[in-house]
């Protein structure tokens, strides 16, 4: 009886020790929504996203003398497209195809530079996101949003530490997008 319980328990602990941590980072920034503009009733915008980063990695970390590449848990272009759709809907726009203004949200850079030693780690995260507004009348506007975030901690940087840094810089960028009215003014001038 004792062997029937002990053997599976020992095997379980041995296998658990071999498990590698996941190589994805849970990207879930806080979405800030802007104030509604009641004068926008009926204005439709179309929205799409693009990820133009040269490398899809969010971070590269050395663990057990090997470089581990960490990627996002979901496609960033769809995440940011969803964010922009929520922000435009909150402002009072309708989102759909063939609007008088097309918005494209582009991820140019999102990366966490992780440096770690024996007792400390540093995570320097940068985001560079652009929104290109193109009106049917030919007018065009590009607005860039940039943010950076640095954090230090003890020992080794975990996936959660890196995810928190990435989510923090994305949350700051999304808040900037929400507070900025330049795209909103461009749409108002070119959608009528």
Curated annotation (Swiss-Prot):
**Topology in the lipid bilayer:** Lipid-anchor
Which residues are modified by lipidation (N-palmitoyl cysteine)?
18
Q: Name the keywords, alphabetized.
A: Cell membrane, Lipoprotein, Membrane, Palmitate, Signal
What's the protein here called? Uncharacterized lipoprotein YajG
GO annotation, cellular component aspect:
plasma membrane
Record-stated family: To H.influenzae HI_0162.
Residues in the signal sequence: 1-17
Tell me the organism's taxonomic lineage: Bacteria, Pseudomonadati, Pseudomonadota, Gammaproteobacteria, Enterobacterales
Q: Where is the lipid attached (S-diacylglycerol cysteine)?
A: 18
Which subcellular locations apply to this protein? Cell membrane
Superkingdom of origin: Bacteria
Pfam families documented for this protein: Lipoprotein_16
Q: What is its main location?
A: membrane
InterPro entries, per database record: Uncharacterised_YajG
């Amino acid at each position: 009886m004792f062997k029937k319980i002990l053997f599976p328990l020992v095997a379980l602990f041995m296998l658990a020790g071999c498990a590698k941590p996941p190589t994805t980072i849970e990207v879930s920034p806080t979405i800030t929504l802007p104030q509604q503009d009641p004068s926008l009733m009926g204005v439709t915008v179309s929205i799409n996203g693009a990820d133009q980063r040269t490398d899809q990695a969010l971070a590269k970390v050395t663990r057990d003398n090997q470089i581990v590449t960490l990627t996002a848990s979901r496609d960033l272009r769809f995440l940011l497209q969803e964010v922009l759709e929520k922000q435009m809907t909150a402002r009072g726009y309708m989102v759909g195809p063939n609007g008088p203004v097309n918005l494209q949200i582009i991820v140019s850079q999102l990366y966490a530079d992780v440096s770690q030693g024996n007792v400390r780690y540093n995570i320097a995260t940068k985001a560079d996101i652009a929104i290109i507004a193109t009106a049917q009348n030919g007018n065009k506007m590009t607005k860039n949003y940039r943010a950076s975030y640095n954090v230090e901690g003890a020992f080794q940087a975990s996936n959660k530490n890196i995810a928190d840094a990435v989510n923090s810089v994305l949350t700051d960028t999304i808040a900037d997008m929400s507070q900025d009215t330049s795209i909103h003014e461009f749409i108002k001038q070119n959608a009528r």
